[in-house]
Swiss-Prot record:
GO MF: metal ion binding; rRNA binding; structural constituent of ribosome
BP GO terms, sorted: translation
GO cellular component: ribonucleoprotein complex; ribosome
Cofactor remark: Binds 1 zinc ion per subunit.
Gene that produces this protein: rpmE
Protein name: Large ribosomal subunit protein bL31
Annotated positions binding Zn(2+): C16, C18, C36, C39
SUPFAM superfamilies cross-referenced by the UniProt entry: L28p-like
Origin organism lineage: Bacteria, Pseudomonadati, Thermodesulfobacteriota, Desulfuromonadia, Geobacterales
C-alpha cells in the first residue's frame, strides 16, 4: 500500500440514542445512531407481527402450523 494516501483507521465509540455504546473501528472520529441491537425490536424480542385481514391465521390453518 502507498504511504500517506489512506485515511486513519482508528477505534471509535458508536453511541446510540437509547444510551448504549460500543467500540468498533472506522475512519470517522465518532458515530451516532438512532437504533442499535440493544433497542431494535427484532433483537429485543418486542417485534410485533402485523396481520392484514387474517392472512397469518389463514396461512397457519392451511399449512397446519399452530
Amino acid at each position: 500500500m502507498k504511504e500517506g494516501i489512506h485515511p486513519m483507521y482508528n477505534e471509535v465509540t458508536v453511541k446510540c440514542a437509547c444510551g448504549n455504546s460500543f467500540l468498533t473501528r472506522s475512519t470517522r472520529k465518532e458515530i451516532f445512531t438512532e437504533i442499535c441491537s440493544a433497542c431494535h425490536p427484532f433483537f429485543t424480542g418486542k417485534q410485533k407481527l402485523v396481520d392484514t385481514a387474517g392472512r397469518v391465521e389463514r396461512f397457519k390453518k392451511r399449512y397446519g402450523q399452530a
